[in-house]
Amino acid sequence: LINHYDIDTKLYSYHDHSSEKEIARLLDFLKDQKDVALISDAGTPTISDPGYSLIRECISEEIDVVPIPGASALTAAISASGLPSDAFTFIGFLPTKKGRQKKISSLENLDTTLVLFESPHRLLKTLNQLKEVLGERPIVVARELTKLYEEIIRGNFGTTIKYFEA
């Protein structure tokens, strides 16, 4: 979008591995009364995104944080799912290794709609693991929302797993 709209500004990368020096540089920039936009290449900043730690630092430094509402995969998916949305639990990304099975097991007794994020290369494995714990329940997999290849697959674990195995 930045290139499309010919926006010419400094860009700084911020991620899980950003150093204290990089964080301090951004905070100094903000303290100098400069405006900064936190954007993400995958959804809403700070939602299952390392941006929350920068926000936390801004708050501790008493730097104003002004949210600008926009597209969110979480709300887009839940609104198009057809599943109950009066109460839902947002899980975010499951751990990739340590604690993964424990986290999945902890979902068993939740009686709300569950919303998870998952990468395409782990999706099938995750669906199978969730099915073992949650049984055959209605599910929706929504991906590439609002993009050219948007896809919303509704069914249960069995039918959805078959869909992705094909």
Task: Outline where the language-model segments fall.
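Class I S-adenosyl-L-methionine
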Residues: 1-66
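Short, acidic/turn-prone active-site loops that include or flank metal/cofactor-
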Residues: 13-20, 71, 91-96, 144-146
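Class I SAM-dependent methyltransferase SAM-binding "motif I" and its flanking Rossmann-like core
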Residues: 53-110
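Short, well-ordered secondary-structure micro-motifs
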Residues: 24, 49, 77-79, 101-102, ...
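General beta-strand structural signal in soluble alpha/beta enzymes
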Residues: 40, 65-70, 116, 141
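Short, hinge-like loop/turn segments at secondary-structure boundaries
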Residues: 5-9, 28-30, 55-57, 81-86, ...
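A contiguous loop/helix-start segment that scaffolds small-molecule binding in enzyme catalytic cores
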Residues: 34-35, 113, 117-166
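Short hydrophobic/aromatic-enriched beta-strand-loop microsegments
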Residues: 8-15, 65, 86-92, 136-142
